[in-house]
Design a protein with these regions (language model features):
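Short, hydrophobic-biased segments on the C-terminal half of alpha helices
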Residues: 44-51
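Short alpha-helical segments that sit at the start of domains
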Residues: 1-16, 20, 77, 92-96, ...
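Short acidic, hydrophobic short linear motifs in intrinsically disordered regions
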Residues: 23-32
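Amphipathic alpha-helical dimerization/coiled-coil segments
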Residues: 82-129
Length: 134
């Protein structure tokens, strides 16, 4: 999966949708990001571009003032987006080389605790079983 290139405004909205944990209407987005000073027409264009890029979808409709408005939800998780960005950045490396390199860098930067180590071992064991079954 290739990570779509997002404008700063698109990424700002995507981060808001990730943190909201539910679909938001255009007025809710505007209200949650008052520092952006967007007008309603601008945000409509931004959301339509995000739909075209496949990072946002219209999930439904909700009451907005006297009428109804579409609700927008992300189609990609924060983790999936970060992984796709990383894969694009390291596209000159083989798959295994990328994974090991990124993992080693993250461990060096962030450190790793016993719980995380156990979860990683469990994930690797599950992957081994899947590969053995093939």
């Amino acid at each position: 999966m290739s990570a779509p290139t997002l404008s700063p405004n698109e990424f700002c909205i995507l981060k808001l949708l990730w943190s909201a944990n539910h679909a938001l209407t255009r007025p809710e987005i505007l209200e949650a990001l008052p520092e952006q000073d967007w007008n309603p027409n601008s945000i409509h264009l931004i959301l339509n571009n995000m739909i075209k890029k496949g990072v946002v979808e219209v999930e439904g409709v909700a009451r907005c003032g006297r009428g109804y408005g579409r609700t927008y939800a992300p189609t990609i998780s924060r983790t999936e987006y970060a992984a796709a960005q990383t894969m694009d950045t390291t596209s000159d490396m083989s798959g295994g080389e990328r994974l090991l390199g990124v993992f080693a860098a993250l461990v060096d930067m962030q450190g790793i605790d016993e719980k995380t180590t156990a979860e990683l071992e469990q994930m690797l064991e599950q992957k081994r079983k899947e590969l053995d079954a093939q």
